[in-house]
Amino acid sequence: MLMPKRVKYRKTMRGRMKGNSGRGTSVDFGSFGLKALEPAWITSRQIEAARVAMTRFMKRDGKIWIRIFPDKPVTKKAAETRMGSGKGSPEFWVAVVKPGRIMFEADGVPREVATEAFRLAAQKLPIKTKFIVRPDYEG
């Protein structure tokens, strides 16, 4: 599971997901990418499930890049706890994803294989996504 080795602050505020992604919006490493079309918190478990789905379909051919990292802790109070008495303890980690963000990239496989691999990965994610190809791709 992806998570930071250490953080400056154990707990963070929830924040808001306004607007589109400012960076990470172009395919930089591979030839194919999976782009987010909606804002969401993507958990480290969802990222891992998508990664496993892609690598299994691609039969470990090619290369996959994960372009998002879960660096935001989400807290949760224990079950049957009364309100008040402070914030809960960190339970899991999420990556804040805004529309336009490239979440995964792949290379070294045919276009049809990449399309299907990203389709399987998208089923593991809680948002609408789009398969995109690098503009200068020759295939």
Swiss-Prot record:
NCBIfam families: rplP_bact. It holds the Pfam family Ribosomal_L16. Keywords: Ribonucleoprotein, Ribosomal protein, RNA-binding, rRNA-binding, tRNA-binding. One of its GO terms (cellular component) is cytosolic large ribosomal subunit. One of its GO terms (biological process) is translation. Binds 23S rRNA and is also seen to make contacts with the A and possibly P site tRNAs. Belongs to the universal ribosomal protein uL16 family. The lineage of its organism: Bacteria, Pseudomonadati, Chlorobiota, Chlorobiia, Chlorobiales. CDD domains: Ribosomal_L16_L10e. Coiled coil: none annotated. Gene3D superfamilies: Ribosomal protein L10e/L16. The keyword Ion transport does not apply. Part of the 50S ribosomal subunit. One of its GO terms (molecular function) is rRNA binding. This is Large ribosomal subunit protein uL16. InterPro entries: Ribosomal_uL16, Ribosomal_uL16_bact-type, Ribosomal_uL16_CS, Ribosomal_uL16_dom, Ribosomal_uL16_sf. The keyword tRNA-binding applies. It comes from Chlorobium phaeobacteroides (strain DSM 266 / SMG 266 / 2430).
